[in-house]
């Protein structure tokens, strides 16, 4: 039986096995899907071992996305822009193909599942790390009016804006540089939720029709989404749908079939 996996450290929390099991039942495909906890300094060896044992593909989670990108022989455009891979495909000719579908998953969740329009909208992204870099390309493809990146270290936000400046109206800065305006979409992309915190955002950013979205899901997303509700945001979503949509795109890469994501999202929401 073909083998697939999610590789990360930690990996115990990953919902990907549950999601792929649901896709497996839905599409009548049979395969094994494993959780592989790779040593922090042993990712390449773990990938080689899995590949040598007949592995066909792997989802990649923290902290190995950049290393997975470097390991690949060929990469999709989104992976090249992000300098990170969210999944690998082990091809018949022995080469490794890297993709990054994080941004695709986000845009699919926002536009298809939640009916949020991104075209000609103002988007604020909070955080300038790898998560933000991974979503910028697909967000810019949606032709927003502008994207503003805000970060505790302004230079990181400026650097990201510079990388993508040819793709559309994009700027970066620190929290004290934020213009007093109401954004259509605010995306939280920092890891502060793991500590039960959220960034020092000023009042006045959220309008009556604003959508606030946390890339994390469950309890980790709670601090930011509670802030959004307190600020009066009309729409508040966590990143569970993004994860499912990401994995649906990976499933299509591996099997050539695009699964129905709605029942899987509903199933996970009922159990989380």
Curated annotation (Swiss-Prot):
Homodimer. This is Shikimate dehydrogenase (NADP(+)). Shikimate binds at residues 14-16, 61, 102, 217. Involved in the biosynthesis of the chorismate, which leads to the biosynthesis of aromatic amino acids. Catalyzes the reversible NADPH linked reduction of 3-dehydroshikimate (DHSA) to yield shikimate (SA). GO terms for cellular component: cytosol. Belongs to the shikimate dehydrogenase family. The keyword NADP applies. It catalyses: shikimate + NADP(+) = 3-dehydroshikimate + NADPH + H(+). InterPro entries: Aminoacid_DH-like_N_sf (IPR046346), NAD(P)-bd_dom_sf (IPR036291), Shikimate_DH (IPR011342), Shikimate_DH-bd_N (IPR013708), Shikimate_DH_fam (IPR022893), Shikm_DH/Glu-tRNA_Rdtase (IPR006151). Its EC number is 1.1.1.25. One of its GO terms (biological process) is aromatic amino acid family biosynthetic process. One of its GO terms (molecular function) is NADP binding. Pathway: Metabolic intermediate biosynthesis; chorismate biosynthesis; chorismate from D-erythrose 4-phosphate and phosphoenolpyruvate: step 4/7. It comes from the Bacteria. Keywords: Amino-acid biosynthesis, Aromatic amino acid biosynthesis, NADP, Oxidoreductase. Disulfide bonds: none annotated. Pfam families: Shikimate_DH (PF01488), Shikimate_dh_N (PF08501). The lineage of its organism: Bacteria, Pseudomonadati, Pseudomonadota, Gammaproteobacteria, Legionellales. The active site is at residue 65. NADP(+) binds at residues 127-131, 151-156, 215, 239. The keyword Hydrolase does not apply.
């Amino acid at each position: 039986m073909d083998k697939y996996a999610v590789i990360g450290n930690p990996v115990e929390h990953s919902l990907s096995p549950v999601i792929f099991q649901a896709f497996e039942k839905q599409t009548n495909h049979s395969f094994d899907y494993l959780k592989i906890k790779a040593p922090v300094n042993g990712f390449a060896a773990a990938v080689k071992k899995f590949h040598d044992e007949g592995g066909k593909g792997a989802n990649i989670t923290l902290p190995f996305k950049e290393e997975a990108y470097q390991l690949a022989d060929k990469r999709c455009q989104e992976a090249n822009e992000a300098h990170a891979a969210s999944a690998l495909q082990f091809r018949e000719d022995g080469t490794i193909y890297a993709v990054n579908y994080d941004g695709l998953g986000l845009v699919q969740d926002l536009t298809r599942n939640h009916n949020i329009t991104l075209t000609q909208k103002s988007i604020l992204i909070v955080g300038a790390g790898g998560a933000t870099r991974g979503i910028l390309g697909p967000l810019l493809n949606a032709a927003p009016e502008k994207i503003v990146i805000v970060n505790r270290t302004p230079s990181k936000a400026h650097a990201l804006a510079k990388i993508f400046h040819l793709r559309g109206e994009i700027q970066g800065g620190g929290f004290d540089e934020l213009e007093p305006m109401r954004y259509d979409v605010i995306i939280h992309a920092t890891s502060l939720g793991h500590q039960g915190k959220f960034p020092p955002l000023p009042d006045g950013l959220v309008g009556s029709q604003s959508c606030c979205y946390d890339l994390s899901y469950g309890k980790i997303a709670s601090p930011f989404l509670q802030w959004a509700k307190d600020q009066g945001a009309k729409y508040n979503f966590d990143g569970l749908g993004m994860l499912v949509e990401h994995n649906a795109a990976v499933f299509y890469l591996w099997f050539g079939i695009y699964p129905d994501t709605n029942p899987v999202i509903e199933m996970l929401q009922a159990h989380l």
